[in-house]
UniProtKB/Swiss-Prot annotation:
Main localisation: cytoplasm
PANTHER family the record matches: RIBOSOMAL RNA SMALL SUBUNIT METHYLTRANSFERASE J (PTHR36112:SF1)
Binding positions for S-adenosyl-L-methionine per the UniProt entry: 102-103, 118-119, 154-155, 172
Taxon lineage: Bacteria, Pseudomonadati, Pseudomonadota, Gammaproteobacteria, Enterobacterales
Domain of life according to the entry: Bacteria
UniProt EC number: 2.1.1.242
Keywords annotated in UniProt: Cytoplasm, Methyltransferase, rRNA processing, S-adenosyl-L-methionine, Transferase
The protein, known as: Ribosomal RNA small subunit methyltransferase J
Subcellular localization: Cytoplasm
InterPro entries registered for this protein in UniProt: 16SrRNA_methylTrfase_J, SAM-dependent_MTases_sf
Coiled-coil regions, chain positions: none
UniProt keyword Methyltransferase present: yes
Name of the top EC class for this enzyme: transferase
Similarity field: Belongs to the methyltransferase superfamily. RsmJ family.
Length: 250
């Protein structure tokens, strides 16, 4: 797990940074090239040795997610089709690899209740910061509080014990990019520097299939092999990804 510096910008609440570190079990490492930076507006992740990559933060209120919510494909989005949204059916979903919460937010904006699991404390802190700002927003706060929640836990452990059982478990494990690093999106380069590869991702499929009551959906790059080497004939395809769909295990 990558080390981080914990920094507060001028005008930010230094006491809030200390409370955040205590809550998420984060320790300041002065030699780390990654930093969690509390600004007066939000919590950000920065790669100090590559400042041109910019800052990573979770924003459910504005930016690309707001645009996607207002003008995106809605129920026609591939992730919506993959989890089975249809008519009045809005499945209860566990996103076991929440990351920056983008797909989870899309599903919540369409009406699903989504529980996000995130094991990395720095990522969980970023997600929670974004959630709290989203909960406080007059437009999306009322439904966001009802539909999108965060659990800081190891997915492998949580999938064995989580109650109530969800209808759908969604998995989007980190997979090495095929492109040269310069072509990988800047935000993903910063994010990957923090979390590394999901080396234990294959171990998620079986417990996910035991927990879900309807289906497990695994998002993969189009060139990636199936998770855990388990092929399935059922998939929703996009130009660059596929959503492999698995039946539950009895």
């Amino acid at each position: 797990m990558a080390a981080v510096q914990l920094l507060a910008e001028e005008g930010a609440d230094a006491a809030a940074l200390s409370a955040l570190a205590q809550r998420w079990g984060l320790c300041h490492d002065a030699d780390a090239v990654l930093a969690l930076v509390l600004t007066p507006q939000r919590l950000e992740l920065r790669k100090l040795d590559e400042p041109k990559l910019g800052a990573i933060f979770v924003d459910f209120v504005g930016g690309t997610l707001a645009h996607r919510r207002r003008f995106g494909g809605g129920r026609g989005e591939a992730v919506a089709k993959a989890v089975g949204i249809k008519g009045g059916y809005l499945p209860d979903v566990v996103d076991a690899t929440a990351g920056l919460g983008r797909d989870a937010f899309v599903l919540a904006s369409l009406g699903c209740r989504v529980r996000m699991l995130e094991r990395h404390p720095a990522v969980a802190a970023l997600l929670d910061d974004g959630l709290q700002r989203g909960y406080a927003d007059a437009e999306i706060g009322p439904w966001l509080r009802e539909r999108l929640t965060l659990l800081h836990a190891s997915s492998i452990e949580a999938l064995a014990t989580l109650t109530p059982r969800p209808e759908v478990v969604y998995l989007d494990p980190m997979f090495p990019h095929r492109q040269k690093s310069a072509l990988v999106k800047k935000d993903m380069r910063v994010f990957q520097a923090l979390v590394g590869a999901d080396d234990d991702a294959d171990a998620l499929l079986a417990p996910a299939r035991r927990l879900a009551t309807k289906r497990v959906v695994v998002k993969r790059p189009d060139y990636a092999p199936p998770l855990a080497g388990v092929a399935t004939p059922n998939a929703t395809l996009t130009k660059s990804h596929r959503f492999d769909i698995y039946a539950p295990l009895a």
